Amino acid sequence: MNEDTESGYMSARASKIFQSKLELLKRESNWAGMVKMLKRYAKRYPNEYYVHQQLAATLYVDSIAQFHLAFQYAEHAMNIEPDDDLNIYTYACALYYIGQLEKSFEFFTKIINKDIQEIAYGEHGEGLRYAKQLINDSVYMAGVVCQRLHRYNEAKDYFVRYLENKKPFQYSDFTKRQATSHLSELTNV
């Protein structure tokens, strides 16, 4: 067993190989293959929170829908690195999928209320575009949670805010169509 495996962390070389494999599987939308690979890496590198976070996010993809297992990996990633905003977002999503709506809402609002500069350029930051996307996706999910909790006016406010903040060509896990669909459902309530 090599040194990086014993420490629970990847070497720089192993990390590059991992990222390359991960990106290829994402491009192909090969979710089952991604789960298989990520489980191998999670076992081999238990201290690499990013592996656990990616596995959690993949497990709650519709075609996989292993929500309780996703929660376990998201929780593990949070235990390793509770200050990473992507971990917080993934954990909040996992909480949502297992029905812990109030707690999920707390974590989404934690991201929403965080300073955008800190998200963009802090220890785990990946730039302003990433920070805007993460905050706006959290706004969308806060709307979804409020809708499920029957807090309809609050849900409307979040969906309107999401649409106002959504810029052309800005990446998001969600579409304008999804947000407007939620809004139209809420106008009938």
Functional labels for PLM-detected ranges:
Residues 9, 40-43, 75-79, 110-113, ...:
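Conserved structural position within tetratricopeptide repeats
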Residues 13-47, 54-61:
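Alpha-helical segment of the N-proximal tetratricopeptide repeat
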Residues 20, 54, 90, 134, ...:
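"A position-specific structural signal for the A-helix of alpha-solenoid helical repeats
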Residues 27, 61-63, 97, 148, ...:
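Register position in tetratricopeptide repeats
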Residues 28-36, 64-76, 98-107, 151-157:
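Structural signature of tandem alpha-helical TPR/SEL1-like repeats
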Residues 51, 87, 120-121, 138, ...:
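TPR alpha-solenoid repeat register
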